[in-house]
Amino acid sequence: FGDADYRPYVCVSDDTHPFSDEEALYAAVTTTQRDAAVLLTDDDFASGGLPRDSYVNPWTVVSIRHADIDHAEGSLADETIERIASEAAGYLGVR
């Protein structure tokens, strides 16, 4: 993510995820603008934020263990997370 040696992710799963106490599903955040990416604005953050213009790739979803998360940059509004999760579901064939 820019000059940093980490990539931010947005958690898109909830407590119904198997082993939710150990891991969750995350969508990748990037500084690369793409037509299908979800732009994050200051209004999308409930707290915190990112230092550069950022976009979520809802087609790049990975399972990450909580122990592997270094720190939180902020938290997104529920409506923003729901929008990202809904778009991610579309890439999985859920309509």
Please place each PLM-identified region on the residue numbering.
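Conserved functional hotspots at enzyme active or ligand-binding sites that engage polyanionic ligands
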Residues: 1-95
